[in-house]
Amino acid sequence: MNTDNRVSPQAPEIEEAILGACLIEQEAMPLAADTLRPEMFYTTSHQVIYAALLAMYRAGMKIDILTVKEELAHRGKLEEAGGAFGITQLSSKVALSLIHI
């Protein structure tokens, strides 16, 4: 428990861009897997999504929007992750992030 009342660092837009990149860019997940852990994500839904992505990557499974939705549904975590629409929306966050750079 955080007893000094400081707010944890958070950047949901960056989290969304990272997750979106992992969904649509094959090179992104190996980089993320080397440096990120699910608990590093501030948003609970992002932790759930990244945990599934990481497990799929480590198992050698194909990662894309459809397979991640299926994996989350199989785990009973799809709604906690933001639902099918939320997962699909992550891919658009990558393009929007690039526009703002």
What is the predicted role of each segment?
Residues M1-L98:
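Noncatalytic partner-interaction/assembly domains of nucleic-acid and motor enzyme complexes
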